A protein has these predicted regions:
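Short, surface-exposed basic-aromatic patches at helix termini and helix-loop junctions that form
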Residues: 10, 34-40, 200-205
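Conserved SF1/SF2 helicase motif Ia
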Residues: 5-17
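Short regulatory helix/loop adjacent to the ATP-binding pocket of P-loop NTPases
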Residues: 32-36, 222-225
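Conserved RecA-like ASCE P-loop NTPase motor core of nucleic-acid helicases/translocases
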Residues: 14-26, 211
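Short glycine-/polar-rich loops that comprise or flank the Walker A/P-loop
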Residues: 13-16, 40-45, 179-180, 206-209
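Basic/charged alpha-beta structural segments of nucleotide/phosphate-handling enzymes
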Residues: 1, 24-28, 34-177
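Short catalytic/ligand-binding loop motif for oxyanion handling, primarily in non-cytosolic enzymes
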Residues: 26-29, 54-56, 192-193, 218-221
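Conserved helicase NTPase motor core
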Residues: 73, 123-242
Length: 244
């Protein structure tokens, strides 16, 4: 990847380069890339994780992105507590849990994970219909009730319960950062469905896009029947998703 980036800097001077890596690795990669360059530095490369990418995209279009919400995280938590109180009579298994102050934060985090995997109230209902375990059925249906009511209440306040990654996806086409950009994605071992949406959008908008996947050999030569047990099962999943 570093070699290709150096080549782009030579062949296309001044054109923006985005190197997307896991958030904890950004500073290490910046240092390694700087040391790799002949001049021991670079000016046109943005080494970012998903969070920093979002910040720079919003900054480029004069938007605060996720921070534009008039409701803080605490405000959303309070709103969720209000929703659960209103729906208490419809809840059986979760009724006692709703009385605990910390449960709204737990539920908020759960809804955040649902959004990352593109799971909504209707998906929870379908999941409840497909399982045979009665307790799991009830839990899924009660979660669907809470999530649906929460989304409706947010809508009444002019808010959306949207995944932060999907906000970046919506903002990217407006960003001048993508003009004649070269995008490189490196160091990831798995992605959520919303991450894939962002990757596809980056690939559509970029002049050039490259993603690296750590695999021991050509994917087609691996034992397909035992892929799930393979040490590289997650990178293989990325490969299968991207080439599908």
């Amino acid at each position: 990847v570093y070699e290709r980036i150096r080549q782009v800097m030579t062949d296309c001077p001044g054109e923006p380069i985005i190197l997307l890596v896991p958030e904890p690795a950004t500073y290490r990669v910046e240092r390694e890339l700087a040391e790799f360059m002949p001049e021991k530095g670079f000016t046109t490369v943005r080494v970012v994780g998903f969070g920093r990418l979002g910040y720079q995209v919003y900054q480029s279009i004069g938007s605060k992105g996720a921070g534009q919400s008039s409701l803080s995280s605490f405000g959303r938590s309070m709103l969720l507590r209000l929703v659960m109180k209103r729906k208490q009579k419809e809840l059986g298994l979760l009724e006692q849990a709703t009385k605990r102050p910390e449960f709204s934060s737990v539920l908020q985090q759960l809804f955040s994970e649902f959004r990352a995997f593109r799971v909504g109230p209707a998906d929870l209902e379908r999941g409840a219909e497909s399982v045979k375990n009665n307790i799991l059925q009830k839990k899924l249906r009660e979660l669907a009730i809470c999530m649906s009511a929460y989304e409706e209440e947010l809508s009444r306040h002019g808010e959306r319960d949207i995944d932060p990654i999907m906000e970046i996806v919506e903002a990217l086409p407006q960003s001048p950062l993508m003009e004649n950009s070269h995008v490189f994605i490196d160091g990831f071992h798995w992605f959520t469905p919303t991450h894939y949406e962002l990757i596809y959008t980056l690939f559509d908008l970029a002049k050039e896009a490259v993603i690296t996947i750590d695999l021991p050999m050509a994917p087609k030569t691996l034992n397909l029947a035992r892929r799930g047990e393979h040490l590289f099962s997650r990178p293989l999943e990325i490969y299968d998703t991207l080439v599908a």
